[in-house]
Swiss-Prot record:
Note describing how the cofactor binds: Binds 1 Fe(2+) ion per subunit.
Cellular component terms per the entry's GO annotation: cytoplasm; EKC/KEOPS complex
Binding site residues for substrate: 126-130, 158, 171, 175, 255
NCBIfam families: arch_KAE1 (TIGR03722), gcp_kae1 (TIGR00329), PRK09605.1 (NF007174)
Places the protein is found: Cytoplasm
Homology family: Belongs to the KAE1 / TsaD family.
Name of the protein this chain belongs to: tRNA N6-adenosine threonylcarbamoyltransferase
HAMAP family registered for this protein in UniProt: Kae1 (MF_01446)
Role summary: Required for the formation of a threonylcarbamoyl group on adenosine at position 37 (t(6)A37) in tRNAs that read codons beginning with adenine. Is a component of the KEOPS complex that is probably involved in the transfer of the threonylcarbamoyl moiety of threonylcarbamoyl-AMP (TC-AMP) to the N6 group of A37. Kae1 likely plays a direct catalytic role in this reaction, but requires other protein(s) of the complex to fulfill this activity.
Molecular function GO terms recorded: iron ion binding; N(6)-L-threonylcarbamoyladenine synthase activity
Lineage: Archaea, Methanobacteriati, Methanobacteriota, Archaeoglobi, Archaeoglobales
Length: 323
């Protein structure tokens, strides 16, 4: 069985085709703003203009008649972007006369991570621009055991990068600068129970930069503080749930320093650490295709008349009836 998935919750526009064995095709055409952060209206216009050619590139590699299921990211995400993707998926499903499956974006990150790494019952640390959560499955639902109280870590990194004059996406640029950092400067460490906050830390880091602290040292201090917070709450969830696997997913999962801190923590606890390949860790169409395929095989289908977008779609809202 073969599924096509369309991802476009924010700046990434991606179409993937998968079967049970692996990724057959994956094409990307992200929206990169000329300056500043992501503008939802401009991002949605980009998606609308580029989707037809992106589909054509996919169908140059895959026979459209071989598609069994059409999946799309139903939420959470930016409303204008989600609507473009949902409209395209509906039209494609109707044209091909194939079933449609709306997929929770966060769930797709976790499931493609499990698929690619072999993790069975992990505590998942989901780190992206729009959100940051500590997730684990309990019964027939994934539950959020801790999350950001304000902005996602990816958004925090981008805000700091923009303030220092760096272009989007800022995360990779902060990572490179941090490698050259030589001095740690204090920043607010905000963990409240299992939740955490980044907005105050961003403001404090921006003030450090404005006061003349080296850009490299600001980046280093920010990463060390933020990633220590994320590692702490992940370790706490691991202990509370008595699990022995950690899965790192989302766009910020590509950060080598975050991987290193989590790996060290897991080694200290005798737990296994997993992270999917970079091309499947961030937002991508293959994760939507795979999760849509998984859902369809277990009885999930989205009627066209109920395929409305859900900008605030929570992972807990999805019933999980597969292993």
């Amino acid at each position: 069985m073969i599924a096509l998935g369309i991802e476009g919750t924010a700046w990434s526009l991606s179409i993937g085709v998968v079967d049970e064995e692996g990724v057959i095709a994956l094409e990307n055409d992200p929206y990169i703003p000329k300056e500043g952060g992501i503008h939802p209206r401009e991002a949605s216009q980009h998606h609308s203009e580029r989707l037809p050619s992106l589909l054509s590139r996919v169908f140059e590699k895959v026979d459209k008649n071989s598609i069994d299921v059409v999946a799309f990211s139903q939420g959470p995400g930016m409303g204008p972007c989600l609507r473009v993707v949902a409209t395209a998926a509906r039209l494609l499903a109707i044209k091909l006369e194939k079933p449609l499956v709306g997929v929770n974006h966060c769930l797709a990150h976790v499931e493609v991570g499990r698929w690619q790494t072999g993790a069975r019952k992990p505590v998942s640390l989901y780190v992206s621009g729009g959100n940051s959560q500590v997730i684990a499955r309990r019964g027939n639902r994934y539950r959020v055991f801790g999350e950001t109280l304000d902005i996602g870590i990816g958004n925090a990194l981008d805000k700091l990068a923009r303030h220092m004059g760096l272009k989007h996406p800022g995360g990779p640029k902060i990572e490179e600068l941090a490698k050259k950092g030589q001095k740690y400067h204090f920043l607010p460490y905000v963990v409240k129970g299992m939740d955490f906050s980044f907005s105050g830390m961003v403001t404090a880091a921006q003030r450090l930069f404005d006061s003349g602290v080296r850009m490299e040292d600001v980046a280093f201090s920010f990463q060390e503080t933020a990633f220590a917070m994320l590692t702490e709450v992940t370790e706490r969830a691991l202990a509370y749930l008595d699990l022995n696997e950690v899965l790192l997913v989302g766009g910020v999962a590509a950060n080598k320093r975050l991987q290193e801190m989590l790996r060290i923590m897991c080694e200290d606890r005798g737990a296994k650490f997993y992270v999917p390949p970079k091309e499947l860790a961030g937002d991508n169409g293959a994760m939507i295709a795979y999760t849509g395929l998984l859902m369809y095989k277990h009885g999930h289908q989205t009627p066209v008349e109920k395929s409305y977008v859900r900008p605030d779609f929570r992972i807990e809202d999805v019933e999980v009836n597969w292993d």
